[in-house]
Amino acid sequence: MPILIHLSDLHFGPAYLSHLGETILKEIDAVNPDAVVVSGDFTMRARHNEYRAARDFLEKITRPTLAIPGNHDQPLFAPIERLVNPFGRYREYINRATDSTLSIGGLFIVGLNDNRRILPGGFWSGAQREWLAAQFASAPSGAVKVVATHHQLMWEGKARPAGFWFPSRALAFLARRGVELVLNGHTHVPSAIQSPEGIVVARSGTATSSRTRHGCGNAYNLITIDEKQISVFVRRFDEQSDGFIAAQADAFPRRLNIG
């Protein structure tokens, strides 16, 4: 049974809560998941010191990890660099590739950089869609296909209409490639829903930033996949126990079992 830990919006910088970061590293060691996915916003303002801290954190993760950038990972206070080389610092410190894959433990995960210099809400280029289709065409037989992006594709149970390539089209595109699970972050609010196509869309809260929203607190997702269902467990930090505890659980039938 594949097990994933899904983190997002770590936001190294002034709002980073180091104690929570250390706690998450211990939980990763204890759970020993097949893979860890970090769906963007490693930094607050893409400063070099923030990226160095993010790199140090990633180097402490003992399991295979897939990372993608978020909108905060483009330098805000270096406008020329943001224009001509927005992910240069990300490539220097985190990963030379902003789109990447990870195949392990019955999982085939594709990470897609959906950030643009000025477009809000996420966007996939034509070249990215071609690359994505090629990756899934070569996926190992029987592997669970997963996509990680920073921006959410669904909001309140509906495809979120943002960007120039609408999420409803993105979900249909992914369904045709056999994708069963999409991971994202961005809003700092955890959720898990299933699209009309049967794709589970799981959003992680902010794992380690003090900038939580809507009273959700700090949280990450623990995801398990068996033959029948995909289960998403939100683990939220609890000050009383000084650790992450189970806060919400959702289980969805796998696409191959729908209809």
Question: Which residue stretches match the model-derived regions?
Answer:
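Beta-strand-turn-beta hairpins that frame and shape the catalytic cleft
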Residues: 1-5, 101-111, 137-144, 195-201
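N-terminal active-site segment of His-dependent metallophosphoesterases
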Residues: 1-60, 76-77, 97, 134
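Active-site neighborhood of phospho(di)ester-bond hydrolases with catalytic His/Asp-centered motifs
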Residues: 7-8, 36-41, 65-71, 113, ...
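Active-site environment of divalent metal-dependent phosphoester hydrolases
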Residues: 13-16, 44-49, 71-79, 117-120, ...
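Extended active-site neighborhood of metal-dependent phosphoesterases/phosphodiesterases
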Residues: 52-131, 139, 173-175, 222
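Short acidic, glycine-rich surface-loop motifs adjacent to enzyme active sites
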Residues: 141-156
